[in-house]
From Swiss-Prot:
<dbReference type="InterPro" id="IPR001705">
    <property type="entry name" value="Ribosomal_bL33"/>
</dbReference>
<protein>
    <recommendedName>
        <fullName>Large ribosomal subunit protein bL33</fullName>
    </recommendedName>
</protein>
<dbReference type="GO" id="GO:0005829">
    <property type="term" value="C:cytosol"/>
</dbReference>
<dbReference type="InterPro" id="IPR018264">
    <property type="entry name" value="Ribosomal_bL33_CS"/>
</dbReference>
<dbReference type="InterPro" id="IPR038584">
    <property type="entry name" value="Ribosomal_bL33_sf"/>
</dbReference>
<comment type="similarity">
    <text>Belongs to the bacterial ribosomal protein bL33 family.</text>
</comment>
<dbReference type="GO" id="GO:0000049">
    <property type="term" value="F:tRNA binding"/>
</dbReference>
<dbReference type="Pfam" id="PF00471">
    <property type="entry name" value="Ribosomal_L33"/>
</dbReference>
<dbReference type="GO" id="GO:0005737">
    <property type="term" value="C:cytoplasm"/>
</dbReference>
<feature type="modified residue" description="N-methylalanine">
    <location>
        <position position="2"/>
    </location>
</feature>
<dbReference type="GO" id="GO:0003735">
    <property type="term" value="F:structural constituent of ribosome"/>
</dbReference>
<keyword id="KW-0694">RNA-binding</keyword>
<keyword id="KW-0488">Methylation</keyword>
<keyword id="KW-0820">tRNA-binding</keyword>
<dbReference type="GO" id="GO:0022625">
    <property type="term" value="C:cytosolic large ribosomal subunit"/>
</dbReference>
<keyword id="KW-0689">Ribosomal protein</keyword>
<dbReference type="GO" id="GO:0002181">
    <property type="term" value="P:cytoplasmic translation"/>
</dbReference>
């Protein structure tokens, strides 16, 4: 079977709460790091989440 192009990534909160989301991204079409505005339930606000590698 062929290996998938999509790679698992972790989106870490920039608020410093330690909260994160996991998702996948296509490295060929989006080689740059993702930055998304999502809800952080710890601070109960929408903050910027930045891409990090899953260990």
């Amino acid at each position: 079977m062929a290996k998938g192009i999509r790679e698992k990534i972790k989106l870490v909160s920039s608020a410093g709460t330690g909260h994160f989301y996991t998702t996948t991204k296509n490295k060929r079409t989006k080689p740059e790091k993702l930055e998304l505005k999502k809800f952080d339930p710890v601070v109960r606000q929408h903050v910027i989440y930045k891409e990090a590698k899953i260990k």
